[in-house]
Amino acid sequence: GIRSLEDAGAAAITMYSLFEEQIMGESHLVDPYLTYGTNSFAAALDYFPEMDSYNVGPEAYLNLISQAKSAVDIPVIGSLNGVSAGGWIEYAKRIQEAGADALELNIYYIPTDIALTATEVEKMYLDDVRLVKAQVDIPVAVKVSPYFSSFANMAAQFVDAGADGLVVFNRFYQPDFDLEQLEVTPNLVFSTSVAMRLALRWVAILYGKVPVDFAITNGVHTYEDVL
């Protein structure tokens, strides 16, 4: 599959994300809020689908990067999805050692703590970038969400923290509610070209003002979208 993408003209391959172990801890932080009241109704067994496993483990992911590098001549970009400083550093280094030409940091964080300030959340993002940049030599692109009070300023801070690129925008998992079973159910809805407009707007605003490369994700479906 990867070789066929190169044959079709792809300039680089961005791998799907390796989810850092701290994500499991984050799901448990969110879980109490979503499972509240599940024992109040006989039909409500669980409001939140358990995240017991991922599609591939860390070792298999690293092996896949090595195999991809051996199979193609174009750059292979690893992707790491996580939160904690220690885990980010460990897997960032291992992804580089596996042969990745660059790394995408896909920071996925849902701040459910009402005592946590916006400043503290922003600092956590920036600290992650600094810690990873201090450990790897390959370029690091940060995949971010638009949910910052001042995204333009945050983009500049990401660059100051060492980001070589910004990928806009992360698409958070948004489950649905089954009113009959009183459960939270997965409901993955694919994007359309309309979803690209927010990213296009911000790239147009920031291009030339923030010295960083931009990449747009979500909503790019046709060659017109690419142009």
How does the language model describe each region?
Residues 51:
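The substrate-binding groove and active-site-proximal loops of carbohydrate-active enzymes
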Residues 2-42, 47, 56-217, 221-227:
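Alpha/beta enzyme core
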